[in-house]
Amino acid sequence: MTVLIGPDPAPRLDKALAREVPEAESLSRSRLSRLIAEGAVALNGKVTTDPRAKLVEGDSVEITVQDAVDVETTPEDIALDILFEDDDLVVVNKPVGMVVHPAPGTPSGTLVNALLHHFGGNLSGIGGEKRPGIVHRIDKDTSGILVVAKSDRAHHGLAAQFEAHSAERHYLAICHGVPNAADPRLRGVKGTSFEEGGILKVTTQLARHKTDRQRQAVLFQGGRHAVTRVRVLESFAETISMVECRLETGRTHQIRVHMSHVGHGLVGDQVYGGRRKVSEKVFGATAQIIAGFPRQALHAASLGFEHPVSGEFMRFEADLPEDMVELLEALRGNGL
């Protein structure tokens, strides 16, 4: 969508768009602010994440908004690994390769299609027809735990916890190198520090990449605040590690971007540089498994939150998927 700025524009970009974007586009002021922060707005052909950018008459503002799904979302008989269910919510363990909700090019086979089959109309409607019950998401090729709202009151309560960053989200990942205090490559990397227990803290801002709209990029001003804490659980000859990543915030691709930023991209991550040459210390079939790992080695292993109705704190865990287990077994069997 392109907006041409007319006479006497508002003094800053966010206010100007709130005034100039047609109501028919259904873009609220808060949604426009998020689009700016995410790098989805270009001023005169150049991406800007500054909501205070000055405008003059004749400026051209391009807004990139994902197209709506134009097909009906239908129930599909897809098996679900249900960890918990009550009248207000359901907790599922999403498999690798499953998209959370329909999107352009993926109208079926999603978690939403499966949820509609299993729960029908017993899902929160706050997310709209295309995202019933969906409170948060994980990437298609990331496995692990999601909580889905069955009632609107649960949706409001859960969404508030994710917004306040009080939900506890822990991921397990397999990355290149060993991201600990002994790694000289981490010295001087902007946005990094070490906490008690050798935990690496990564603090940056994230926004959509200026040239590749499918990626996120690290910024230090103008994006959305993002914090990840990384703890090494197991390492293999200083060349591969299993790590726990704890999200303080939950931005798109956050763990993958942060691990790439600190020079420890996830094994198999084709977008953020995890497909790199395997160390000579890894040999034989193990080297082939690492080099050919088909997706980012990332699993949403633990989710904790306060039940939005009962107030009880609940925590759920999901075992590593088979492909990551096999990768770890190969590394351990390689004598590293």
Where are these regions (language model features)?
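RNA pseudouridine synthases
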Residues: 1-336
